Each structure stands twice: as structure tokens, then as C-alpha cells.
Amino acid sequence: MTRVMDGLVIVLLGLVGWGLWRAGRAYVKLRGTRVVACPETEQPAAVELAPWQAAITAIVREPSLRLRDCSRWREIAPCQQACLGRIAEALEECVVSTILSKWYAGKVCTCCGRPVGQISRWRHQPCLMSPGMRIFEWKDIASENVPAVLRTHAPVCWRCLVAETHIS
């Protein structure tokens, strides 16, 4: 009898571990701010998914996508969340950090000419220079404005930001 119980406990622990792994994977994959064209206005909107809800549903089935926040909700009441289809189609590509990483890939600093290099969460982030020659960090940009800013601004490395802020 104890071998049967031991076997059931092992199977049960395996199922719990598998469920926790699926939940954790969904949470990590679905967190972060995304930029997507709002289906109602076709304007860029910064959205955040509800990763905990998706993680919980991922234990037993495909993660359920729901919005936790949207930059358009400040202007209009919460919507029908029609953008979720667009997000599901480009889950990784619409994450702000992915958009920025792809944009910086292969670029050189406007000030010093050094390669910007690969973007890493653990290193200093490259910056941007406006057409008016003002240098600023990513955190100074509203996420919904990232696509427009990247069309008009130039890449700047962290060293040049530090040098510029110490000179002025």
C-alpha cells in the first residue's frame, strides 16, 4: 500500500511542479509594457496585460489574456479590449524593450560613433537624442510615444549621456 501511495505522491508532485512551471513561464512571458495600435483609433497605445491572471489560467489551459492597464483609458472609458488579438499575434514583438532592442541593433552613437551594442537589462541603457539635440533616457518617454520618437530621434550611448550631463 505504501508503494502505491508513494507513487501517487510522486505523480501529484510532478503535476504540481508542471503547473507551477507553466504558470511561471506565462507570467514571465506576459509581463511588461507593450505598444499596440488601438483598434478604435489606430493610434499607438501602451498596454499592460494582467500576468497573474494569465499565469493562473496557464496551469490548466492556454493563458487567458486580459488588460490590466491601457494609456487610452485615461481618455476613454475601459474598452472591449479588441487589441488583445493583435497582442496575441505579436506577443514578443510589441513589448517596448523588444522594440527598443531591435531599433538599437547595429546602430552607433550619434555623439562618439561607438557601437551602441546589445541591450541588456543588467547594463546601462543607451539613450536618445532629439532633433533639438537634447539627450534623454528611455524612462523619459511615454511608452505609447516610442514608435514616433524612434522615427525622429538618434541613438546615444550611456557614456555620452554621462559626459553630457556632467558638462552642462
Language model regions located:
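Feature marks short, highly hydrophobic, charge-poor N-terminal signal-anchor/signal peptide-like helices
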Residues: M1-V9
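Transmembrane-cytosolic junction motif
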Residues: L15-T41
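Short metal-coordination and nucleic-acid-contact micro-motifs, chiefly zinc-binding Cys/His arrays
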Residues: R31-R34, R66, K102-G106, L150-H153
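Acidic, Ser/Thr-rich low-complexity segments on the non-lumenal side of membrane proteins
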Residues: A37-P78
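Short cysteine-rich clusters marking metal-coordination/redox-active sites
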Residues: C38, L67-C70, C109-C112, A154-C160
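Short cysteine/histidine-rich metal-coordination sites, predominantly Zn2+-binding motifs
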Residues: P51-E62, G85-E92, T98-K102, H124-W138
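Extracytoplasmic/periplasmic C-terminal soluble domains
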Residues: L128-S168
